[in-house]
Amino acid sequence: MDFNLNDEQELFVAGIRELMASENWEAYFAECDRDSVYPERFVKALADMGIDSLLIPEEHGGLDAGFVTLAAVWMELGRLGAPTYVLYQLPGGFNTFLREGTQEQIDKIMAFRGTGKQMWNSAITEPGAGSDVGSLKTTYTRRNGKIYLNGSKCFITSSAYTPYIVVMARDGASPDKPVYTEWFVDMSKPGIKVTKLEKLGLRMDSCCEITFDDVELDEKDMFGREGNGFNSVKEEFDHERFLVALTNYGTAMCAFEDAARYANQRVQFGEAIGRFQLIQEKFAHMAIKLNSMKNMLYEAAWKADNGTITSGDAAMCKYFCANAAFEVVDSAMQVLGGVGIAGNHRISRFWRDLRVDRVSGGSDEMQILTLGRAVLKQYR
């Protein structure tokens, strides 16, 4: 596996560097984080570069650049301080619809290309069904030629502003043998109530509770095939976990570089603190973790481009990178001392964001379970 970037990939990365140097994005990110506001202006700038077309097939007007290119772009964005967690639907969200959606649904989502606006997200988690997705209670029932959606979802990302969501629900007419199906829901429909929740980190992307009270749908609003709900989201879950891991690496690399520059400049006891062995030890451990993350992610991206990536690979990336990145940021914060925990240094935002990522997108514990099963399955 050769992970040297080709000319096209180098151009993308160079474009990212140019964009990030074009203005004081950090001040904008800090404001959006403080106010829990989606950074639409920044996402629009990325969309203008074609980032939202990276994985779209050429026959649909996309670049079909592949996952290694995506990884290189994501890592560089994160290294330069961008909140890449707000972009999870940007590269893969269109492909989900190209794979599962009707032409009408595809047209509605593809209209968001190049806009930078939030377009859709999945609504699966419920108050009583987090990791145990088989315990979903939200139902769809058929009455008089219509579909009626009832129940509630919680911790649903992007749902404060997104115009559409894809809701996982069970057939209310089949209580003994659950049938799970996804539905494409226009958020402007009557009977939908959205309550925004406050959270520790990842504050630039909304997190909401959504209730459905006899929300009326049509058969054409079915997303994918009836009864195929869990199968259709499996690839989406794996894709999300890979993107979370890429975000973790980029954020950790940014914190590492901030701390390294500080260690070489901060003078105590007559010399730069970077000359002290205990500080050097921290950087040695951070560098080992960062290098391990990077190699793991590029291998996973290569597998994705060659059609060999598995759910176990995605779980390994998600678990290792979420934990290693948090440890790197925590160590970097220790190096920064009071500067890192007081005032407005971005490392405090990184610390909060990475702590959330050990829960969101699949908890640490669920990644370990998924990976353990995948490993043992190879030896049956």
Swiss-Prot record:
Cellular component aspect of the GO annotation: cytoplasm
Listed InterPro entries: Acyl-CoA_DH_CS, Acyl-CoA_Oxase/DH_mid-dom, Acyl-CoA_Oxase/DH_mid-dom_sf, AcylCo_DH-like_C, AcylCo_DH/oxidase_C, AcylCoA_DH/ox_N, AcylCoA_DH/ox_N_sf, AcylCoA_DH/oxidase_NM_dom_sf
Cofactors: FAD
Keyword set includes Flavoprotein: yes
GO biological process, one term: carnitine metabolic process
EC number: 1.3.8.13
GO MF annotations, alphabetized: acyl-CoA dehydrogenase activity; flavin adenine dinucleotide binding
Pathway info: Amine and polyamine metabolism; carnitine metabolism
Cellular localisation: Cytoplasm
Catalytic activity: 4-(trimethylamino)butanoyl-CoA + oxidized [electron-transfer flavoprotein] + H(+) = crotonobetainyl-CoA + reduced [electron-transfer flavoprotein]
Pfam families from the UniProt entry: Acyl-CoA_dh_1, Acyl-CoA_dh_M, Acyl-CoA_dh_N
Keywords for the protein's UniProt record, in alphabetical order: Cytoplasm, FAD, Flavoprotein, Oxidoreductase
Family, similarity comment: Belongs to the acyl-CoA dehydrogenase family.
Quaternary structure and interacting proteins, as annotated: Homotetramer.
Function: Catalyzes the reduction of crotonobetainyl-CoA to gamma-butyrobetainyl-CoA.
Annotated NCBIfam families: PRK03354.1
Name recorded for this polypeptide: Crotonobetainyl-CoA reductase
Species this chain originates from: Shigella flexneri serotype 5b (strain 8401)
